[in-house]
A protein has these predicted regions:
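A short, histidine- and acid-enriched strand-loop-helix "catalytic/donor-clamping" loop
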Residues: 1-14, 30
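Membrane-proximal helix-turn-helix segments that form the acceptor-binding/catalytic region
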Residues: 13-31
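Donor nucleotide-sugar binding/catalytic pocket of nucleotide-sugar-dependent glycosyltransferases
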Residues: 29-43, 48-67, 77-79
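Short, polar loop motifs at secondary-structure junctions
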Residues: 36-39, 109-116, 179-183
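Conserved catalytic-core segment of nucleotide-activated headgroup transferases in glycan assembly
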Residues: 64, 72-137
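Acidic donor-binding loop of glycosyltransferase active sites
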Residues: 142-159, 174-175
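Short hydrophobic faces within alpha-helices
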Residues: 168-169
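Short acidic/histidine- and often glycine-rich active-site loop of Leloir-type glycosyltransferases
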Residues: 180-192
Length: 192
């Protein structure tokens, strides 16, 4: 994911990066892409290796990420959820938004924001990552149930980002606002 993202400005690094990617593409039998944008980019740039490239749509376990609980949109305080740890999330944006919209509660689950910084009073920062045990999937499912909206602000890149959070949230009946990037995994499947 993100291997073909061309964000290197240094000409020497760019030269060696391009050689590495060409060699990588040459030696492997199959290259699987989770982002349709990156898949199309790689197909165009390395068209001689097109037969090795496959787009695999990202999915989620809809049996687990499911709820019958109805959202209470009439509640006086509404909860906005942000989850993520990869380098393409826009952490500055979510913190700025939380400080500007004080009448919403923000639950931010990440290890990328230090808990020693001054946070707005409406922010509940939870340290969590998919591969640690700080927050179980069952706990996360409850947080999705309690949230009125999931925000996934992203920095522009060919690297796909936010698929699991978006699909889990939608499966739980929680609407999602996500940045459309060059690496958006299946842009034709999402509207507005």
């Amino acid at each position: 994911m993100g291997l073909y993202n061309q964000s290197v400005n240094n000409p020497i690094k760019k030269f060696f990066r391009n050689k590495f990617i060409y060699f990588f593409t040459l030696i492997f039998d199959k290259l699987i892409f989770l982002s349709h944008g990156e898949y199309e980019f790689a197909e165009q740039k390395y068209f001689n290796f097109k037969n090795k490239m496959y787009f695999l749509p990202f999915s989620t376990d809809v049996d687990f990420w499911n709820t019958n609980k109805k959202k209470n949109y009439e509640s006086p305080r509404k909860q906005i959820l942000f989850i993520g740890n990869d380098g393409k999330r826009d952490y500055d944006f979510i913190l700025k938004l939380a400080s500007e919209i004080q009448d919403y509660d923000f639950v931010i689950i990440t290890k990328k924001i230090e808990n020693n910084i001054k946070l707005p009073k409406n922010v509940n920062l939870l340290s969590g990552k998919w591969d640690d045990l700080n927050i179980s999937d069952k706990d996360l499912r409850t947080i999705y149930e309690e949230s009125h909206l999931t925000l996934i602000p992203l920095l522009d890149s060919l690297q796909p980002s936010g698929q699991s959070v978006a699909l889990q949230s939608l499966s739980m009946g929680t609407p999602v606002i996500i940045t459309r990037t060059k690496g958006f995994w299946e842009p034709d499947k999402f509207v507005n």
